[in-house]
Amino acid sequence: MKCFEDLKWRGLVKDISSPELEDKLNNEKLTFYIGTDPTADSMHIGHFSSFLIATRLAKYGHKPILLVGGATGLIGDPKPSQERKMITREEVNKNVAGLTKQAHDIFGFDVVNNYDWTKDISVIDFLRDYGKYINVNYMLDKDIIKRRLESGITFCEFAYTLLQGLDFVTLNKNYGVTLQVAGSDQWGNITTGIELSRKMEGPELFGMTMPLVLDANGVKFGKTEGNALWLDKNKTSSYELFQYLINTDDACVIDYLKKLTFLSKEKIESIEEKQKEHPEDRIAQYSLAREVITFLHGEEEYNKALKISKDLFSGDIKDLTLDEIKDGFKDVPSFDITENMTLIDLLVNNNIASSKREAREFISAGSISINGEKETEETKTIDSSYAIGGEVVVIRRGKKKYYLGIFK
């Protein structure tokens, strides 16, 4: 399968600036770039689909460059509804360093920073050398600008698209970049760069956008209860990422396999058939989790996440290490435990049971487990010998309600 055909089959092409791009991707070796502004010191899983296409294009012989917007990050891409909050120079510099390291470590990309070529351009030079080529009416026709005109848009935000156009022209001059790839929300910024090069009598530049990856409810992939899933495993553990991916809706999982993995067309179609025959096995979800986590963090991290999941499901808490327990129970209710606290007091004081009578009922019914083992003695006391790693005790009520007790 040729490059463009592969991208189309995977649903990775939304808009292209010229029909010529298909032939160029299939038969030439292009240098292209993908950019991100440093709003945080780590990429999140939503970036993953965008940057994975760069790796995919590289496998077809094209050369990727990642641009981290040390300059544009100081301005902020206009949001559809309101002005974006500016971040400090110190934050931007810290975030640039984090993203640059991550791009090298995960994707192996060459990284450039647009602050390097914008920092010495004066306002006069910017307006004379670049601003004179872009008509205001052209900028007003951008969708994002149209949406903001009624509520108001600052000149700072208005000029953002011209700064990104400057990036494209500069990357072409310095690195031979002829293609920008981005999410569909960046189409207006891509076309500004193409127009700027044309007006400056430069070479023809090309753009391609990808559809946003959405879940079954139309929410952007990677958004979970308002929290981002980070590619930095110190911010989002492999187990947390595993849980997110393994719970992918059946309606979306094949689409995700196409867009977020390097599995072949034949392999994905085989998985799809098995998923239809036995949806309860969730073979597609496990395949997705394995491919994504292994790519980001390695096979060992995937196996670790899988082990935590299996042990938690089976109740084999004692087979888990302290670190695995902390990963697996990061979001469950936790509380302090004192030496020789009675089991009944532990349940009542921490709202696991509403009263001592209810606590006794839970215990006698076998509904309470400590570190995976049922406790049926009402007089049981919990001492530090129960503490896994000398720190934590895992309490379960019923089949799914977990709590984490921490010895102090």
PLM segments and residue spans:
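Well-ordered mid-protein domain cores that form the structural environment of catalytic cofactors
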Residues: 59, 63-76, 83-107
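N-terminal catalytic cores of NTP/NDP-binding nucleotidyl/phosphoryl-transfer enzymes
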Residues: 21-78, 180-187
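Positively charged, low-complexity intrinsically disordered leader regions
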Residues: 1-33
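Acidic/polar active-site rim loop that often engages polyanionic ligands
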Residues: 73-84, 171-175, 225
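Short acidic, glycine/serine/threonine-rich loops at helix termini
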Residues: 76-80, 121-127, 219-225
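Conserved nucleotide- and phosphate/pyrophosphate-binding catalytic cores
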Residues: 200-408
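Divalent-metal (Mg2+/Mn2+/Ca2+)-assisted nucleotide/phosphate chemistry catalytic cores
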Residues: 10, 88-96, 100-209, 214-216
